[in-house]
């Protein structure tokens, strides 16, 4: 029988995280271990203080890192290295399983030996607005599907879509492909999904596996999130240069506007257009971030730590360990000429 570990990165977890753990423990296919990669211990300790959490959930392992250490790709990769199962289910702290068959349904996708990763359907919360509810339906339809390189021509960038808000990975395939990129602002799941497709493996979308997960972001938040998305695509032209996301975005806006008209919500169309404009503006700025002043980037990003880490990583490549000091521009030029 296959063994399964769960990985959950957390930062300032709340009651949804506790509900998530409780529902994971009630699954028809139980996880062997639940690995929590927590950023900033004080917030985690504050949540579980006096709850006997660790006594209640013996299979939960918690590892603490600082906010400065966190990276969307590297932190998840560190967690994967700690797993021992045949499969690893990655979730976010605010994704709540709808029923007790989440793991069972995701695991069923791997009956096809070519499937490297399977992701779940995300349903909106009861508090979600009309636009967010339709967006979830657009991105996570009621019909399951399996995607391969053959789908690139008609699905375009959606071939690579695979959200690790709730996604299960075949560990052998993950290791074969090198895992998540180790330094990224965002979008590590899609970057890895592209490697899956390009290597000949498949991605399964399991509509039967469901979690409640949605966000009603403000226009400013949408702009900043899509700025980070644009940065991730600009940093990986080998993946995204050949596929356009613009057509998919236009399709979403058009279909959402049509839906609002049909359901008597015409008053929300203006809000939709403003929100979509903020998304697109953020995305374009992110795609062209190398042309922007650093102070702009600091205002536009949701992930300031990424840029701090990025600067440190770039600086470390300039260190000559044989001399003990940073290389000058002249020394770098001489080395290239050699």
Roles of regions detected by a PLM:
Residues 100-133:
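Conserved donor NDP-sugar-binding/catalytic core segment of glycosyltransferases
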Residues 88:
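Short aromatic/hydrophobic "clamp" motif used to bind/position activated sugar donors
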Residues 13-26:
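Short, well-formed alpha-helical segments that are part of the catalytic scaffolds
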Residues 66-83:
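Glycine-rich, basic loop-to-helix element that forms the pyrophosphate-binding segment
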Residues 32-42, 63-65:
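Short beta-strand/loop segment that forms part of the nucleotide-sugar
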Residues 149-169, 185:
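A recurrent flexible, glycine/aromatic-enriched loop bordering the glycosyltransferase active site
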Residues 228, 242-338:
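Non-catalytic, C-terminal membrane-associated alpha-helical segments of glycosyltransferases
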